[in-house]
UniProtKB/Swiss-Prot annotation:
It comes from Alteromonas mediterranea (strain DSM 17117 / CIP 110805 / LMG 28347 / Deep ecotype). Keywords: Cell cycle, Cell division, Cell inner membrane, Cell membrane, Cell shape, Cell wall biogenesis/degradation, Glycosyltransferase, Membrane, Peptidoglycan synthesis, Transferase. Signal peptide: none annotated. This is UDP-N-acetylglucosamine--N-acetylmuramyl-(pentapeptide) pyrophosphoryl-undecaprenol N-acetylglucosamine transferase. SUPFAM superfamilies: UDP-Glycosyltransferase/glycogen phosphorylase. Gene3D superfamilies: Glycogen Phosphorylase B (3.40.50.2000). Its main location: membrane. Pfam families: Glyco_tran_28_C, Glyco_transf_28.
């Protein structure tokens, strides 16, 4: 009889896509996969496209909200715990693996109360509150970045750095060749602001880079933002033949393949994909991210000289200068991308799968 794994992940691609990578790898080995999430978040649309049964619980976030919202969230949390317990009792999975998101907390607690082993995967260099709590009852705590290890000191014996699972097509992105940079007079810049777009990138990139000679730009600006971004480029006299705008990029692997370097936020999945693609990057961490986790994610590459980081507060002053430097010395861009590739966790997905099988085999 096939082993069964319940994946818990939701809210953002940073949680969902690593979960999908592991789900698909386990399914390829004959496992039966189910998913626990929330009906209002992106997992409700994305997961069914992969033919994975998804089960919903009525949970909401609590952190950083007003007293009324917190009370409502607490009530929903209690309901979601009982809902998760009913679902898990019915499914009887051999193991539950949480990748973060609202469903992971109640799902992990419910699984443990039923004697089902729990694995937690933390993508960020600064661990989230839910995973910190779940680590106390988890059989294993798996980390995307080694810098997060000190935050799980209470579960030190069960903490393992495995990297962040990345989709196979990202790993297939071909490295840039040194000879293509000999005497290069142009570079391709990919600007990625996430599914909603990043307002600071939409405003600053056109102003600071729109008229740089030798720069071709693909700019993902988020749904509903393209008209304003076009005007921003046109207002500085940019040649729109060298600028391509999109609300959303469906094929990120092709976008990375085209790019010489990327300007982007520093979510855990983005940082991991940049490294896997072997591209140089200028990270602009979201300054209001919980526990400043995006800065810590970016630093995992920056401290290896494998990426640049510019604080949002000084982006306007420094972005154009950084891009001009690469246009003048494109070989530096190539070298940084190659260094980024050496920081990538190429075996992350199989590492997680190995831990899943190990825990089930041990009967923890």
């Amino acid at each position: 009889m096939a082993k069964r794994c319940l994946i818990m992940a939701g809210g953002t691609g940073g949680h969902v896509f690593p979960g999908l990578a592991v789900a698909n790898a386990l399914r390829a080995e004959g496992w039966d996969i189910h998913w626990l999430g929330t009906a209002e978040r992106m997992e409700a649309q994305v997961v069914p496209k992969h033919d994975i049964p998804i089960h919903f619980i009525p949970v909401k976030g609590l952190r950083g909200k007003g007293i009324s919202a917190r009370i409502q969230g607490a009530v929903a949390l209690v309901k979601s715990l009982f809902s998760a317990r009913r679902i898990i009792k019915r499914l009887q999975p051999d193991i539950v693996v949480g990748f973060g998101g609202y469903a992971s907390g109640p799902g992990g607690v419910a699984a443990k109360s039923l004697g089902i082993p729990v694995i937690v995967h933390e993508q960020n260099a600064a661990a989230g509150m839910t995973n910190k709590l779940l680590s106390k009852l988890a059989s294993r705590v798996l980390l995307g970045f080694d810098d997060a290890k000190e935050q799980f000191s209470g579960a030190a014996d069960n903490v393992h750095t495995v990297g962040n699972p990345v989709r196979d097509d990202i790993w297939q992105v071909k490295p840039k060749k040194r000879e293509s940079y000999a005497g290069a007079t142009s570079l391709n810049m990919l600007v990625v602001g996430g599914s909603l777009g990043a307002q600071i990138l939409n405003e600053t990139v056109p102003e600071t880079c729109g008229v740089l000679n030798g720069l071709s730009i693909k700019h993902q600006c988020g749904k509903g933002n393209s008209d304003g971004v076009v005007k921003a480029y046109e207002s500085v006299g940019a040649d729109m033949a060298n600028v391509e705008l999109s609300d959303f990029i469906d094929n990120m692997a092709a976008a990375y393949e085209w790019a010489d370097f990327i300007v982007c936020r520093a979510g855990a999945l983005t940082v991991s994909e940049v490294a896997a693609s072997g591209r140089a990057a200028i990270f602009v961490p979201l300054p209001f991210a919980v526990d400043d986790h995006q800065t810590k994610n970016a630093q995992s590459l920056v401290k290896q000289n494998a990426a640049l980081m510019i604080a949002q507060s000084v982006l306007k002053q420094n972005l154009g200068q950084a891009v001009r430097r690469w246009l003048e010395h494109p070989e530096d861009c190539l070298k940084m991308g190659a260094l980024a590739k050496t920081c990538a966790s190429i075996h992350a997905t199989e590492n997680v799968v190995s831990h899943v099988k190990s825990v089930v085999g041990e009967g923890d």
